Swiss-Prot record:
The keyword Chaperone does not apply. HAMAP family: PDRP (MF_00921). PANTHER family: PYRUVATE, PHOSPHATE DIKINASE REGULATORY PROTEIN 1, CHLOROPLASTIC. Signal peptide: none annotated. ADP binds at G150, V151, S152, R153, T154, S155, K156, T157. GO terms for molecular function: ADP binding; ATP binding; phosphotransferase activity, phosphate group as acceptor; protein serine/threonine kinase activity. This is Putative pyruvate, phosphate dikinase regulatory protein 2. Pfam families: Kinase-PPPase. It comes from the Bacteria. It catalyses: N(tele)-phospho-L-histidyl/L-threonyl-[pyruvate, phosphate dikinase] + ADP = N(tele)-phospho-L-histidyl/O-phospho-L-threonyl-[pyruvate, phosphate dikinase] + AMP + H(+); N(tele)-phospho-L-histidyl/O-phospho-L-threonyl-[pyruvate, phosphate dikinase] + phosphate + H(+) = N(tele)-phospho-L-histidyl/L-threonyl-[pyruvate, phosphate dikinase] + diphosphate. Bifunctional serine/threonine kinase and phosphorylase involved in the regulation of the pyruvate, phosphate dikinase (PPDK) by catalyzing its phosphorylation/dephosphorylation. Belongs to the pyruvate, phosphate/water dikinase regulatory protein family. PDRP subfamily. Its EC number is 2.7.11.32, 2.7.4.27.
Amino acid sequence: MTAIPIFIISDSIGETARTVIAAVNAQFPASVTLKIQRFPFITDQKTLTPILQDAHQEQAIIVSTLVNHTLQETVTQFCQAKHLTLIDLLSPLTTAISERSQTASLETPGSLRKLDEHYFHRISAMEFAVRYDDGQDPRGLLEADIVLLGVSRTSKTPLSMYLANQNYRVANLPLIPNVPLPKELFKVPAHKIIGLTMPLSTLLKIRQERLATLGLPQTTNYSNMTTVGDELAYANQIFEQLNATTINVADRSIEETASLIQTLI
């Protein structure tokens, strides 16, 4: 079967049309193929006219995401005159919302793409959280919006990732007795540092369950009451030394703790 020609015409990058076409194409067997040509950043009649002529020559389906009413009207009239199939993705909904709200649309190309900048910031924050998870690189402590400290199993990593999804750059560092702390930590402003803790009994239970899940014996320092108690005491000492805000994460969901942190920083 000959590939079906499709022209995407947009005054932005045409990603909205591409996504819709991909979703529709997935509903057909592999024998149905599309020849997609994308024409982005079309902002004047001079550029638009030859594209429409080429579409006519190829008998293409035109998929448009033009926010400029004048340009879209040109496409509509051309398709009607030449009997071309036109899929106008934006105009029907734009008109409906405009009529219902009694408000004219902005006709600003790329508005959705500008919103996508928020997405890229979030991805950057998540990459930051992965790079500086578990004290992998202490240099991240100085670049972070939030620094999480705590002994093992106090939810440092899941909290880091959740907060990163809220656009915060988060680094976390495990507190282990007799392991020197990086010098960078003492340069971080106190208001950025959050100490995570919980009662000894709760932490012991969590660690014991962790060992059971891994099929490991319970007779290790990891779940020894005295050792774990010493870890918590050491962590509290560091929190006090750094003047860090301390949060008891026991019986709190990740979402609840993250929300509390956001109100504190």
